[in-house]
Swiss-Prot record:
Stretches with biased composition (Polar residues): 285-295, 385-396
Basic and acidic residues composition bias: residue spans: 196-205, 263-284, 297-312
Region listing for Disordered, in residue ranges: 176-327, 375-397
Residues that bind Zn(2+) 1: 513, 516, 537, 540
One GO-annotated biological process of the protein: cellular response to interleukin-4
Record-given protein name: RUN and FYVE domain-containing protein 4
Function: ARL8 effector that promotes the coupling of endolysosomes to dynein-dynactin for retrograde transport along microtubules. Acts by binding both GTP-bound ARL8 and dynein-dynactin. In nonneuronal cells, promotes concentration of endolysosomes in the juxtanuclear area. In hippocampal neurons, drives retrograde transport of endolysosomes from the axon to the soma. Positive regulator of macroautophagy in dendritic cells. Increases autophagic flux, probably by stimulating both autophagosome formation and facilitating tethering with lysosomes.
Zinc recorded as keyword: yes
Top-level taxon in the UniProt lineage: Eukaryota
Coiled coil: 421-462
Family matches, as InterPro entries: RUFY4, Run_dom, Run_dom_sf, Znf_FYVE-rel, Znf_FYVE_PHD, Znf_RING/FYVE/PHD
One Pfam family it belongs to: RUFY4
Native species: Mus musculus (Mouse)
Database matches in Gene3D superfamilies: 1.20.58.900, Zinc/RING finger domain, C3HC4 (zinc finger)
Length: 563
């Protein structure tokens, strides 16, 4: 009973190890690596199973044989496993049979062939009895089936293992301890990372990972807050100011609206004009002129900074920085007023957000003014509520009209828009052509599939018809074989009878009775046997069980046939 308990305990521990691996690494999860504690548990259970109640055998040189010798003896008869055997034998650093057996287990786990290898090893029960005692679970049919079922479940788990380890002669590699303690204490090296494993990114305590700001709103808000701080009244250092202007220029370029946004806004302006809404053409022209003026001021500041940097003297004064800040705030206020008059339905939005959009989306304002400038033929009627609001702005910005007209008449921007539109149209045509080609390919594949389906059905029908015909022919051949067997038996029986008659005639001397071997005299009555034809005296023909005209031998055979 104690032996049965030990056997069941070994089988149960192996099942638990397999279930732990399936729970942690099954269903397409990450592969099992050297640092997995479940791997160490599984390898230990497999080694205990293969070493339990193993008979002691020694080689020619006196070395003790282990379960590797059993696996090698069982698998070398199968051609499909010669490559694995040669791979294990080619590892010169493994000196013992125990180390080679461990390497073979790891190789089968990595290739998903452990269950198949074990099943091939257990196909020959006589060989298994030569290597293992009666207490081994490998000799019990029920436990053997349970073990193979558990091992076949591991075929769906990926194992990422090092197949050429020189330290398997000593023990199984135990890298899971390195997670809790340093490698210097344990004395074992840390395993290398598998290919494709992401590298760790280490940050200091005060650092944070910065994600790219796609919208650019946080950068703009920080820039605006910095413009409003009183620290900007102080003169900036010459080494930091050019980089600041470069960053602002790059942010303004990266935040330019794409062509789709421009088309949407242009359609909105056209709908407003058709509905008779407010027409902010003059206000947009004034804001465009002010923006152009601020741009020219920024260029002057940049040129001054560049010249001073080359000469190595001077710095940018605080008044110019304040002027730039005031220009940005003025453009924000003008854009807020224009947006409030053009789109009354958008009053729920925050004014600060609209101001930031106006500050850094200068190409949007230029595109809108260009569209309004090209549509000079459309009627422009200003309502009375607009007259009081825009009259002051028109008087103040009357000197900036020529500059705005130059911006409107600039054909370079229109050419850029036309190029972008042509590129988008080309991309659309290419995508439509690709879609059409894919649809044609899909239709062809469907037709081919239908054709193949019809051919498959025809082949199946033909195969069924041939199968029925072959079955009929097979039945006929079976009947013929049975008839031939019966005829052969009849011929054999007839041959035996003829041989028996011939033997009887050859043994009986002429002039003697077949039954009692009596010598016939001149007056003795004699009768021929009606079956074999031999001469029988009157006593033998009448007294033998009342069978007349029959010798005793033929009478016995006839009795046997009747029974």
């Amino acid at each position: 009973m104690a032996n049965n308990g030990t056997i069941l305990k070994i089988s149960r521990s192996l099942k638990n190890a397999v279930s732990a691996i399936l729970q942690g690494y099954g269903d397409g999860q990450e592969p099992v690596t050297e640092t997995s504690a479940e791997l160490h548990r599984l390898c230990g259970c497999l080694e205990l199973l293969l070493q339990f109640d193993q008979k002691e055998q020694r080689s020619f040189l006196g070395a003790r044989k282990d379960y590797w010798d059993f696996l090698f003896t069982a698998l070398r008869r199968h051609r499909g496993y010669t490559e694995q055997m040669s791979f294990i034998c080619s590892q010169d650093k493994l000196k013992t049979s125990l180390g080679k057996g461990r390497a073979f287990i790891r190789l089968c786990l990595a290739r998903g062939q452990l269950a198949e290898s074990m099943q091939l090893c257990l196909l020959n029960p006589q060989l298994t009895r030569e290597w293992y005692g009666p207490r081994s679970p490998l000799l019990c049919a029920e436990l053997q089936e349970d073990i193979l079922d558990s091992l076949y479940a591991l075929n769906g788990v990926a194992f990422n293992l090092d197949l050429q380890r020189p330290d398997l002669d000593e023990a199984w590699p135990m890298f899971s301890e390195s997670r809790c303690s340093s490698p210097s204490r344990t004395g074992k090296r840390r395993p290398g990372k598998p290919k494709g494993f992401p590298e760790e990114v280490r940050c200091s305590r005060g650092e944070q990972l910065q994600e790219p700001d796609t919208g650019g709103t946080s950068c703009l808000q920080d820039a605006t807050r910095e413009d409003r701080t009183p620290d900007l009244c102080k003169p900036l250092q010459p080494s930091h100011l050019p980089t600041f202007l470069e960053e602002k220029r790059e942010d303004s370029r990266s935040l330019s609206c794409p062509q789709s946004t421009w088309e949407t806004e242009r359609e909105g302006f056209q709908l407003d004009q058709k509905d008779g809404g407010p027409k902010p053409r003059k206000f947009l022209e004034n804001s465009t002129a002010s923006i152009q003026q601020q741009r020219s001021r920024a260029k002057d500041v940049k040129m001054q900074l560049t010249g001073r940097k080359v000469e190595g003297k001077g710095s940018l004064s605080g008044t110019e920085d304040q002027r730039t800040t005031e220009g940005i705030q003025k453009r924000a206020a003008d854009w807020d007023l224009g947006q409030g008059l053009m789109a009354p339905g958008l009053q729920g939005r925050e004014d600060a957000e609209l101001g930031y959009r106006c500050e850094w989306n200068q190409p949007d304002v230029l595109r809108q003014s260009w569209v309004l400038g090209t549509k000079k033929s459309s009627p422009t009627e200003k309502p009375q509520e607009w007259t009081g609001v825009t009259s002051g702005t028109m008087q103040e910005d009357g000197s900036e009209v020529p500059l705005q007209q130059e911006v409107i008449k600039d054909p370079g921007y229109g050419l850029q828009l036309a190029k972008e539109q042509a590129q988008c149209q080309e991309q659309l045509r290419a995508q439509e052509a690709e879609l059409q080609a894919l649809q044609e390919q899909l239709s062809r594949c469907q037709k081919e599939r239908a054709l193949l389906q019809v051919k498959l059905e025809q082949k199946q029908q033909e195969a069924e018809r041939r199968d029925a015909m072959y079955q009929t022919e097979l039945e006929g051949q079976r009947d013929l074989v049975q008839a031939m067997k019966r005829r052969v038996l009849e011929l054999i029986h007839e041959k035996d009878l003829q041989w028996q008659r011939l033997q009887q005639l050859s043994t009986v001397a002429p002039g003697h009775c077949i039954g009692c071997n009596k010598v016939f005299r001149r007056l003795s009555r004699r009768y021929p046997c009606r079956l074999c034809g031999g001469l029988v005296c009157h006593a033998c023909s009448v007294d033998y069980k009342k069978r007349e005209r029959c010798c005793p031998t033929c009478a016995q055979q006839e009795e046997i046939q009747d029974t």
